[in-house]
């Protein structure tokens, strides 16, 4: 048996044992796994994920620095699920959910289940009960860092019990994984970044709650604020970069940039302009943007305004972009790539 046949036999054996998509070629454009997904509210991120959105029946981790857009991205995913008639829940361990902002992002508050638990154990027990019901489509836990173990709450200020939160997360995820898969519920954990002390080489960044979530998550998204969107001197939004650090559904390491506008969420028209230029669908000549010889405007903001005022043209460009998703995904892969800044260091459990 030659090498290629031996390799094919090994690959088919792996797929029979562990399921289709358990091994793939990194450069493959095919959506190797037929899986139900929910849009993130960002066309570029849906394309970068390779399967058209975040997968159902899986654990997702969204992490990044403060005010980078983690909760916004989770709420936009909830809004997209609700548009399809899905039932969503929000476990607000931080006790910081702003209902006015959530409504502006398109979340139907009347049909959103919300819990503000007192302890980490209570939060994860509520999560487990909702997942086991099999009736919840998207469940968000905000955030892992706020899942404080009962022993820590009942103890004295200054008491330290090493690895308590990491053990809590590890036990909960072992219990949750099978239920999540059976119920087809998407569980999104929002996480924060901490700095490891005394790191000489590599990134000092790590995420809270130990290493268990890194292993159990099918998709990990690293979201960062990279700049401000200004109108004259006033800041009206954030320029945001999201990197797909881990992806079990399609090739990872793709990277996408978009604007998050205050009180609006992800700027869909801004994405159409940026992705259109990247795919060659929207032409850029100097400062002018045009589509099929029709001028959209001088400057990016004017082009965004034109598309906002002409929804039919915006839909036409979006359709063209979806048809060119494979080409755009290749560009994302060229821009992305594993680097030491993905927050996925070999950290020990959070103390």
From Swiss-Prot:
Its main location: cytoplasm. It is found in: Cytoplasm. Residues 330-351 are annotated as: Disordered. ATP binds at residues 64-71. PROSITE patterns: RECA_1 (PS00321), RECA_2 (PS50162), RECA_3 (PS50163). One of its GO terms (cellular component) is cytosol. InterPro entries: AAA+_ATPase, DNA_recomb/repair_RecA, DNA_recomb/repair_RecA_CS, P-loop_NTPase, RecA-like_C, RecA-like_N, RecA_ATP-bd, RecA_C_sf. Residues 339-351 have a biased composition (Acidic residues). Gene3D superfamilies: P-loop containing nucleotide triphosphate hydrolases (3.40.50.300). GO terms for biological process: DNA recombination; DNA repair; SOS response. It holds the Pfam family RecA_C. GO terms for molecular function: ATP binding; ATP hydrolysis activity; ATP-dependent DNA damage sensor activity; damaged DNA binding; single-stranded DNA binding. It comes from the Bacteria. Keywords: ATP-binding, Cytoplasm, DNA damage, DNA recombination, DNA repair, DNA-binding, Nucleotide-binding, SOS response. NCBIfam families: tigrfam_recA. Belongs to the RecA family. Can catalyze the hydrolysis of ATP in the presence of single-stranded DNA, the ATP-dependent uptake of single-stranded DNA by duplex DNA, and the ATP-dependent hybridization of homologous single-stranded DNAs. It interacts with LexA causing its activation and leading to its autocatalytic cleavage. This is Protein RecA. It comes from Rhizobium leguminosarum bv. viciae.
